[in-house]
Amino acid sequence: MERTLAHVPSMELSTEALLVTGGLDNTNKMITSSAVRNDDGTMISQHSEKVSYGTSGAPDGSTPPVTAAGGGSEGNGIGGGGGGGGGMVGDGTGHSVGSSASGNDDDKPAKQKRHRTRFTPAQLNELERNFAKTHYPDIFMREEIAMRVGLTESRVQVWFQNRRAKWKKRKKTTNVFRTPGALLPSHGLAQFPSPMNDSFCNFHGQDTRGWPAMSGMTTHMAPHMTTHMPSHQMSQMGGGPGSALALPPSIPRQGLGQSMQQQTVNCTMGQSTGLNTLSMGTNGSMGSMTSMYQPSLGGMTTGSMSSGLSSPSPPNLPVSDSSTDLSCSVSDAGDMWRGTSIASLRRKALEHAASLNGNL
Protein backbone atom coordinates (compact mmCIF):
# COMPACT_ATOMS: atom_id res chain seq x y z
CA MET A 1 0.00 0.00 0.00
CA GLU A 2 1.15 3.58 -0.65
CA ARG A 3 0.69 6.86 1.09
CA THR A 4 1.11 10.18 -0.77
CA LEU A 5 0.70 13.70 0.72
CA ALA A 6 1.25 17.07 -1.04
CA HIS A 7 1.61 20.61 0.46
CA VAL A 8 0.42 19.53 3.85
CA PRO A 9 1.18 21.75 6.90
CA SER A 10 3.23 20.38 9.75
CA MET A 11 0.26 19.96 12.07
CA GLU A 12 -1.71 18.05 9.52
CA LEU A 13 1.36 16.08 8.57
CA SER A 14 2.00 15.01 12.12
CA THR A 15 -1.62 13.97 12.59
CA GLU A 16 -1.67 12.07 9.32
CA ALA A 17 1.63 10.47 10.04
CA LEU A 18 0.40 9.19 13.34
CA LEU A 19 -2.67 7.70 11.67
CA VAL A 20 -0.62 5.99 9.02
CA THR A 21 2.08 4.62 11.28
CA GLY A 22 -0.24 3.38 13.99
CA GLY A 23 -0.11 -0.13 12.60
CA LEU A 24 3.71 -0.30 12.25
CA ASP A 25 6.32 -1.40 14.81
CA ASN A 26 7.95 0.86 17.44
CA THR A 27 11.15 1.67 15.43
CA ASN A 28 9.23 3.08 12.48
CA LYS A 29 7.08 5.08 14.83
CA MET A 30 10.08 6.82 16.35
CA ILE A 31 11.64 7.66 13.03
CA THR A 32 8.44 9.01 11.66
CA SER A 33 7.68 11.06 14.76
CA SER A 34 11.16 12.69 14.66
CA ALA A 35 10.63 13.54 11.08
CA VAL A 36 7.27 15.05 11.81
CA ARG A 37 8.59 17.21 14.69
CA ASN A 38 11.17 18.74 12.42
CA ASP A 39 9.26 21.65 10.88
CA ASP A 40 11.97 23.10 8.59
CA GLY A 41 11.01 20.80 5.77
CA THR A 42 14.24 18.81 5.56
CA MET A 43 12.32 15.56 5.32
CA ILE A 44 10.59 16.66 2.18
CA SER A 45 12.13 15.28 -0.95
CA GLN A 46 14.20 17.68 -2.91
CA HIS A 47 12.98 16.36 -6.23
CA SER A 48 9.32 16.74 -5.36
CA GLU A 49 7.07 18.81 -3.25
CA LYS A 50 5.21 15.72 -2.08
CA VAL A 51 6.22 13.34 0.57
CA SER A 52 5.70 9.62 0.08
CA TYR A 53 5.66 7.23 2.95
CA GLY A 54 5.90 3.53 2.15
CA THR A 55 3.86 1.34 4.47
CA SER A 56 5.19 -1.89 3.02
CA GLY A 57 8.71 -2.66 1.99
CA ALA A 58 11.22 -5.34 1.33
CA PRO A 59 12.36 -7.70 4.08
CA ASP A 60 15.72 -5.89 4.36
CA GLY A 61 14.07 -2.61 5.33
CA SER A 62 14.61 -0.70 2.06
CA THR A 63 11.65 0.80 0.24
CA PRO A 64 11.23 0.74 -3.50
CA PRO A 65 10.90 4.05 -5.33
CA VAL A 66 7.43 5.45 -5.25
CA THR A 67 5.94 7.59 -8.01
CA ALA A 68 4.33 10.77 -6.74
CA ALA A 69 0.70 11.29 -7.60
CA GLY A 70 1.14 15.00 -8.43
CA GLY A 71 4.33 15.03 -10.58
CA GLY A 72 6.70 12.98 -12.65
CA SER A 73 9.69 12.87 -10.29
CA GLU A 74 10.57 10.00 -8.01
CA GLY A 75 11.70 10.20 -4.40
CA ASN A 76 12.70 7.97 -1.54
CA GLY A 77 10.46 7.99 1.44
CA ILE A 78 11.00 6.87 4.95
CA GLY A 79 9.80 3.32 5.24
CA GLY A 80 10.06 0.48 7.59
CA GLY A 81 10.18 -3.24 7.35
CA GLY A 82 7.43 -5.56 6.30
CA GLY A 83 4.03 -4.05 5.98
CA GLY A 84 0.52 -5.19 6.51
CA GLY A 85 -2.55 -5.63 4.43
CA GLY A 86 -5.08 -2.85 4.46
CA GLY A 87 -4.19 0.75 5.15
CA MET A 88 -5.03 4.34 4.36
CA VAL A 89 -4.53 5.52 0.77
CA GLY A 90 -4.17 9.20 -0.09
CA ASP A 91 -6.04 10.69 -3.00
CA GLY A 92 -3.65 13.63 -3.62
CA THR A 93 -5.70 16.22 -1.76
CA GLY A 94 -4.77 15.35 1.81
CA HIS A 95 -7.80 13.22 2.44
CA SER A 96 -7.42 9.59 3.26
CA VAL A 97 -9.58 6.85 1.80
CA GLY A 98 -9.95 3.54 3.59
CA SER A 99 -9.63 0.38 1.56
CA SER A 100 -10.94 -2.95 2.76
CA ALA A 101 -11.48 -6.28 1.11
CA SER A 102 -15.08 -7.39 1.40
CA GLY A 103 -16.45 -10.79 0.38
CA ASN A 104 -18.92 -11.23 -2.41
CA ASP A 105 -22.34 -11.57 -0.84
CA ASP A 106 -24.31 -13.40 -3.48
CA ASP A 107 -28.02 -12.88 -2.87
CA LYS A 108 -29.69 -16.31 -3.01
CA PRO A 109 -32.92 -16.32 -5.02
CA ALA A 110 -36.06 -16.76 -2.91
CA LYS A 111 -37.59 -20.24 -3.06
CA GLN A 112 -40.61 -20.25 -5.30
CA LYS A 113 -43.80 -21.46 -3.67
CA ARG A 114 -45.65 -23.90 -5.87
CA HIS A 115 -49.30 -23.04 -6.09
CA ARG A 116 -51.92 -25.74 -5.76
CA THR A 117 -53.13 -27.01 -9.10
CA ARG A 118 -56.81 -26.31 -9.61
CA PHE A 119 -58.44 -28.80 -11.95
CA THR A 120 -61.49 -27.93 -13.98
CA PRO A 121 -64.50 -30.29 -14.03
CA ALA A 122 -63.64 -31.32 -17.59
CA GLN A 123 -60.09 -32.22 -16.57
CA LEU A 124 -61.31 -34.17 -13.56
CA ASN A 125 -63.80 -36.10 -15.68
CA GLU A 126 -61.10 -37.04 -18.17
CA LEU A 127 -58.68 -38.07 -15.41
CA GLU A 128 -61.33 -40.12 -13.62
CA ARG A 129 -62.28 -41.85 -16.86
CA ASN A 130 -58.66 -42.88 -17.45
CA PHE A 131 -58.28 -43.91 -13.81
CA ALA A 132 -61.23 -46.26 -14.26
CA LYS A 133 -59.32 -47.90 -17.13
CA THR A 134 -56.00 -48.30 -15.32
CA HIS A 135 -54.54 -47.16 -12.03
CA TYR A 136 -50.94 -47.24 -13.28
CA PRO A 137 -50.66 -45.45 -16.64
CA ASP A 138 -47.30 -45.55 -18.40
CA ILE A 139 -45.37 -42.52 -19.60
CA PHE A 140 -46.96 -42.55 -23.05
CA MET A 141 -50.46 -42.67 -21.66
CA ARG A 142 -49.68 -39.88 -19.20
CA GLU A 143 -48.34 -37.68 -21.98
CA GLU A 144 -51.42 -38.33 -24.06
CA ILE A 145 -53.69 -37.45 -21.14
CA ALA A 146 -51.65 -34.31 -20.46
CA MET A 147 -52.09 -33.19 -24.06
CA ARG A 148 -55.83 -33.78 -23.91
CA VAL A 149 -56.48 -31.99 -20.60
CA GLY A 150 -53.91 -29.22 -21.05
CA LEU A 151 -51.60 -30.13 -18.15
CA THR A 152 -48.01 -31.20 -17.81
CA GLU A 153 -47.04 -34.84 -17.57
CA SER A 154 -45.68 -34.34 -14.05
CA ARG A 155 -49.02 -32.92 -12.87
CA VAL A 156 -50.85 -35.89 -14.36
CA GLN A 157 -48.45 -38.28 -12.64
CA VAL A 158 -48.92 -36.59 -9.26
CA TRP A 159 -52.70 -36.67 -9.70
CA PHE A 160 -52.63 -40.42 -10.36
CA GLN A 161 -50.45 -40.97 -7.28
CA ASN A 162 -52.86 -39.05 -5.06
CA ARG A 163 -55.83 -40.78 -6.64
CA ARG A 164 -54.35 -44.23 -6.00
CA ALA A 165 -53.68 -43.34 -2.35
CA LYS A 166 -57.26 -42.13 -1.95
CA TRP A 167 -58.62 -45.28 -3.59
CA LYS A 168 -56.56 -47.58 -1.34
CA LYS A 169 -57.67 -45.74 1.78
CA ARG A 170 -61.32 -45.95 0.77
CA LYS A 171 -60.97 -49.63 -0.05
CA LYS A 172 -59.43 -50.36 3.34
CA THR A 173 -62.23 -48.52 5.13
CA THR A 174 -64.87 -50.34 3.10
CA ASN A 175 -63.34 -53.72 3.89
CA VAL A 176 -63.43 -52.94 7.60
CA PHE A 177 -67.14 -52.15 7.46
CA ARG A 178 -67.90 -55.17 5.31
CA THR A 179 -66.22 -57.63 7.67
CA PRO A 180 -68.90 -60.02 8.99
CA GLY A 181 -69.49 -59.53 12.68
CA ALA A 182 -67.20 -56.50 12.94
CA LEU A 183 -69.94 -54.16 14.18
CA LEU A 184 -72.45 -56.75 15.39
CA PRO A 185 -72.72 -57.87 19.03
CA SER A 186 -71.04 -61.11 19.96
CA HIS A 187 -74.17 -62.63 21.51
CA GLY A 188 -77.10 -63.68 19.40
CA LEU A 189 -80.69 -62.61 19.80
CA ALA A 190 -83.14 -64.89 21.54
CA GLN A 191 -85.25 -67.00 19.21
CA PHE A 192 -89.03 -67.14 19.46
CA PRO A 193 -90.70 -70.53 19.77
CA SER A 194 -91.59 -72.12 16.47
CA PRO A 195 -95.41 -71.91 16.84
CA MET A 196 -95.22 -68.23 17.71
CA ASN A 197 -92.90 -67.63 14.75
CA ASP A 198 -95.34 -69.28 12.41
CA SER A 199 -98.32 -67.34 13.73
CA PHE A 200 -96.63 -63.92 13.71
CA CYS A 201 -95.10 -64.49 10.28
CA ASN A 202 -98.53 -65.35 8.94
CA PHE A 203 -99.93 -62.21 10.55
CA HIS A 204 -97.32 -59.89 9.03
CA GLY A 205 -97.34 -61.67 5.70
CA GLN A 206 -101.10 -61.21 5.29
CA ASP A 207 -100.79 -57.52 6.36
CA THR A 208 -104.52 -57.25 7.29
CA ARG A 209 -105.55 -56.80 3.68
CA GLY A 210 -108.59 -59.01 4.06
CA TRP A 211 -110.61 -60.30 7.01
CA PRO A 212 -110.66 -63.88 5.64
CA ALA A 213 -106.89 -63.92 6.02
CA MET A 214 -107.26 -62.67 9.60
CA SER A 215 -109.78 -65.36 10.38
CA GLY A 216 -107.37 -67.96 9.00
CA MET A 217 -104.64 -66.55 11.19
CA THR A 218 -106.75 -66.74 14.33
CA THR A 219 -107.87 -70.26 13.48
CA HIS A 220 -104.24 -71.26 13.08
CA MET A 221 -103.25 -69.48 16.28
CA ALA A 222 -105.89 -70.95 18.60
CA PRO A 223 -104.65 -74.58 18.71
CA HIS A 224 -101.09 -73.42 19.31
CA MET A 225 -102.22 -71.29 22.22
CA THR A 226 -104.16 -74.17 23.76
CA THR A 227 -101.58 -76.90 23.25
CA HIS A 228 -98.15 -75.23 23.33
CA MET A 229 -98.46 -72.25 25.66
CA PRO A 230 -98.42 -72.71 29.45
CA SER A 231 -100.42 -70.52 31.78
CA HIS A 232 -97.64 -68.04 32.68
CA GLN A 233 -96.86 -67.39 28.99
CA MET A 234 -100.51 -66.72 28.33
CA SER A 235 -100.64 -64.25 31.23
CA GLN A 236 -97.49 -62.48 30.00
CA MET A 237 -98.88 -62.27 26.52
CA GLY A 238 -102.14 -60.81 27.75
CA GLY A 239 -100.71 -58.33 30.29
CA GLY A 240 -97.53 -57.19 28.53
CA PRO A 241 -97.26 -54.18 26.27
CA GLY A 242 -96.89 -56.41 23.24
CA SER A 243 -100.53 -57.54 23.50
CA ALA A 244 -101.76 -54.32 21.96
CA LEU A 245 -99.31 -54.77 19.09
CA ALA A 246 -100.39 -58.33 18.47
CA LEU A 247 -103.93 -57.20 17.65
CA PRO A 248 -104.75 -55.86 14.19
CA PRO A 249 -105.16 -52.06 14.09
CA SER A 250 -108.54 -52.18 12.38
CA ILE A 251 -110.37 -54.01 15.20
CA PRO A 252 -113.06 -51.66 16.57
CA ARG A 253 -113.17 -50.81 20.24
CA GLN A 254 -116.81 -51.78 20.63
CA GLY A 255 -116.33 -55.22 19.10
CA LEU A 256 -113.21 -55.82 21.16
CA GLY A 257 -115.00 -54.93 24.37
CA GLN A 258 -117.87 -57.29 23.54
CA SER A 259 -115.45 -60.11 22.82
CA MET A 260 -113.64 -59.50 26.11
CA GLN A 261 -116.91 -59.59 28.03
CA GLN A 262 -117.88 -62.81 26.31
CA GLN A 263 -114.50 -64.34 27.11
CA THR A 264 -114.79 -63.27 30.77
CA VAL A 265 -118.22 -64.89 31.04
CA ASN A 266 -116.84 -68.07 29.53
CA CYS A 267 -113.98 -68.07 32.03
CA THR A 268 -116.30 -67.64 35.00
CA MET A 269 -118.56 -70.40 33.73
CA GLY A 270 -115.51 -72.56 33.27
CA GLN A 271 -114.46 -71.91 36.84
CA SER A 272 -117.78 -73.12 38.21
CA THR A 273 -117.69 -76.13 35.93
CA GLY A 274 -114.13 -76.91 36.99
CA LEU A 275 -115.06 -76.70 40.67
CA ASN A 276 -117.99 -79.05 40.13
CA THR A 277 -115.73 -81.63 38.49
CA LEU A 278 -113.17 -81.88 41.31
CA SER A 279 -114.41 -85.35 42.18
CA MET A 280 -113.22 -86.66 38.82
CA GLY A 281 -109.69 -87.98 38.19
CA THR A 282 -106.72 -85.86 37.37
CA ASN A 283 -106.73 -86.78 33.69
CA GLY A 284 -110.41 -86.07 33.44
CA SER A 285 -110.03 -82.66 35.09
CA MET A 286 -107.19 -81.70 32.78
CA GLY A 287 -109.17 -82.79 29.76
CA SER A 288 -112.19 -80.79 30.88
CA MET A 289 -110.07 -77.69 31.40
CA THR A 290 -108.59 -78.02 27.92
CA SER A 291 -112.01 -78.48 26.39
CA MET A 292 -113.25 -75.50 28.39
CA TYR A 293 -110.51 -73.10 27.20
CA GLN A 294 -110.70 -74.10 23.57
CA PRO A 295 -114.34 -73.00 23.12
CA SER A 296 -113.69 -69.80 25.07
CA LEU A 297 -110.82 -68.79 22.80
CA GLY A 298 -112.80 -69.78 19.77
CA GLY A 299 -115.71 -67.67 20.98
CA MET A 300 -113.38 -64.75 21.58
CA THR A 301 -111.99 -64.79 18.06
CA THR A 302 -115.37 -65.44 16.45
CA GLY A 303 -117.08 -62.67 18.41
CA SER A 304 -114.35 -60.16 17.69
CA MET A 305 -114.33 -60.95 13.99
CA SER A 306 -118.09 -60.68 13.67
CA SER A 307 -118.22 -57.41 15.61
CA GLY A 308 -115.34 -55.97 13.53
CA LEU A 309 -117.14 -56.78 10.28
CA SER A 310 -120.41 -55.28 11.48
CA SER A 311 -119.06 -51.89 12.66
CA PRO A 312 -115.72 -50.79 11.12
CA SER A 313 -113.81 -47.87 12.65
CA PRO A 314 -110.50 -46.02 12.10
CA PRO A 315 -107.39 -48.13 12.84
CA ASN A 316 -105.75 -45.61 15.16
CA LEU A 317 -108.02 -46.12 18.19
CA PRO A 318 -106.26 -47.11 21.45
CA VAL A 319 -106.76 -50.63 22.76
CA SER A 320 -105.24 -50.28 26.22
CA ASP A 321 -108.52 -50.94 28.08
CA SER A 322 -109.23 -54.06 26.10
CA SER A 323 -105.71 -55.38 26.70
CA THR A 324 -106.21 -54.80 30.44
CA ASP A 325 -109.46 -56.80 30.38
CA LEU A 326 -107.74 -59.58 28.50
CA SER A 327 -104.88 -59.70 31.00
CA CYS A 328 -107.31 -59.86 33.93
CA SER A 329 -109.34 -62.64 32.37
CA VAL A 330 -106.29 -64.71 31.45
CA SER A 331 -104.74 -64.20 34.89
CA ASP A 332 -108.00 -65.41 36.47
CA ALA A 333 -107.75 -68.48 34.30
CA GLY A 334 -104.20 -69.04 35.52
CA ASP A 335 -105.36 -68.79 39.13
CA MET A 336 -108.05 -71.36 38.38
CA TRP A 337 -105.44 -73.71 36.96
CA ARG A 338 -103.35 -73.26 40.07
CA GLY A 339 -106.33 -73.81 42.37
CA THR A 340 -107.36 -76.93 40.51
CA SER A 341 -103.93 -78.45 40.85
CA ILE A 342 -103.84 -77.75 44.61
CA ALA A 343 -107.32 -79.19 45.04
CA SER A 344 -106.36 -82.31 43.14
CA LEU A 345 -103.29 -82.75 45.33
CA ARG A 346 -105.40 -82.39 48.46
CA ARG A 347 -107.91 -84.85 47.08
CA LYS A 348 -105.15 -87.34 46.37
CA ALA A 349 -103.79 -86.89 49.88
CA LEU A 350 -107.23 -87.54 51.39
CA GLU A 351 -107.72 -90.61 49.21
CA HIS A 352 -104.31 -91.93 50.21
CA ALA A 353 -105.06 -91.35 53.89
CA ALA A 354 -108.43 -93.06 53.51
CA SER A 355 -106.82 -96.03 51.80
CA LEU A 356 -104.27 -96.30 54.58
CA ASN A 357 -107.04 -96.20 57.20
CA GLY A 358 -108.98 -98.85 55.29
CA ASN A 359 -105.99 -101.13 55.19
CA LEU A 360 -105.54 -100.78 58.91
Curated annotation (Swiss-Prot):
Example of a GO cellular component annotation carried by this entry: nucleus
Primary localisation category: nucleus
Keywords from the named record: Developmental protein, DNA-binding, Homeobox, Nucleus, Transcription, Transcription regulation
GO BP annotations listed: neuron differentiation
Region (Disordered): 48-117, 295-326
Biased composition (Gly residues): 69-95
Pfam family, one: OAR
Family assignment from sequence similarity: Belongs to the paired homeobox family. Bicoid subfamily.
Name of the protein this chain belongs to: Homeobox protein orthopedia
